[in-house]
Amino acid sequence: RDLHKEYRRQRQMCIRDSLPIGHNQTISQPYIVAYMTEQLQVEKHQKVLEIGTGSGYQAAILAELANNVFTIEIIPELAEGAEKVLNKTGYDNITVRTGDGYKGWPDQAPFDRIMVTAAPEEIPEKLVQQLANDGRMIIPVGANLFMQYLWLIKKDKDGIVKKEKILPVRFVPMVKE
């Protein structure tokens, strides 16, 4: 798909810095987008929840890998902009909604994979509850911009949850309604 035509900063997509997308938000560094996507181990038959739609770029990547992507953005203007771009580029397996990511998307749960692209102070229990058995969630966590870590949450086939701290990161804070 021709995402680069819609996400015009093609040269900047190779740098190691986050990029501003308006409303005091950023798109993650390209290597973090790739790393988080790889850690999720998304398969084609799966249903994915993304918290923090932003520009829609990460949702588009997930949609190339998964059957269905549901993405929530708390800032209405970003959600609307992302939805326009995603529709224009032919992504019919992505559903965009404006809302509070802390609540997840209960009427579409459970999700095989959950990706969170903004940092809450703690892992939201509602998101863990919406993770399917044999599911994986990747989430940056930390109140202080300089003390955040990326966590990989795995729920086994019996519903037992294991949490692994994997990498120091810097993300915008996750916002509640």
Residue ranges and their predicted role:
Residues 41-160:
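Conserved nucleotide-cofactor-binding alpha/beta core module
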Residues 7, 26-29, 33, 55, ...:
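Short, conserved glycine- and acidic-residue-centered signature motifs
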Residues 3, 37, 102-103:
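Short hydrophobic/charged patches on amphipathic alpha-helices used for structural packing
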Residues 1-15:
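Single conserved hydrophobic/aromatic residue that forms the stacking wall/gate
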